[in-house]
Amino acid sequence: MKKVSIYNKLHFLVLPIACCLFIASCKQIDVYEKNTVIPNYEWSSSFTASGNFVIKDTVSAYSIYLVLRHTDAYKYNNIWLNIGLQPPGDSLIKQKVDLQLGDDVNGWEGTGMNDIWEVRKLLNGQPRRFKQAGNYNFSISQIMRDNPLTNIMSVGIRVEKRNP
């Protein structure tokens, strides 16, 4: 008769428990992100990036990020944007945003690879709660003097549900 060591018995017990704990520890983060590619990296003032996201939980707070990707050849340290948010069944709320992309001393903000830079900035400085559940529409347009504004690759919104 073959002897089964205590280690073999533990192996068959520990492995399934470890797998269950690993699977249970994986928590899905509620995230929405939509980025719109700017055609030919030339953002005309008439071109508006837009999209929509659904809010189901009105108790939790959400972080809303503006995501912008540009090349190293972009000639300004900032970009002025008109950001619109339309709650379900309500009118459009517009906000002008001066998004700082860098400065002359420290260079570009965000993450970069070769000559491409991505900046992700929290809008309004803190997470917010949505008053009503439903479909929210957003729009982003550039309001700089240059038309078209060159070397902007994409722009979008990222919405993350914060942990309570």
Residue ranges and their predicted role:
Residues 75-81, 151-154:
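Short coil-to-beta strand junction motifs in C2/discoidin
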Residues 34-54:
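Post-signal peptide N-terminal segment of mature Sec-exported envelope proteins
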Residues 66-74:
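Short amphipathic, basic-aromatic surface patches that mediate peripheral association
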Residues 131-147, 151-161:
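Internal, hydrophobic beta-strand segments that form the core of beta-sheet-rich folds
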Residues 22-25:
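C-terminal motif of bacterial Sec signal peptides marking the signal peptidase cleavage site
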Residues 2-14:
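Bacterial N-terminal signal peptides that target proteins for export
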Residues 96-129:
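An anionic, turn-rich surface loop/hairpin at beta-sheet edges
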Residues 27-30:
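Bacterial signal peptide processing site
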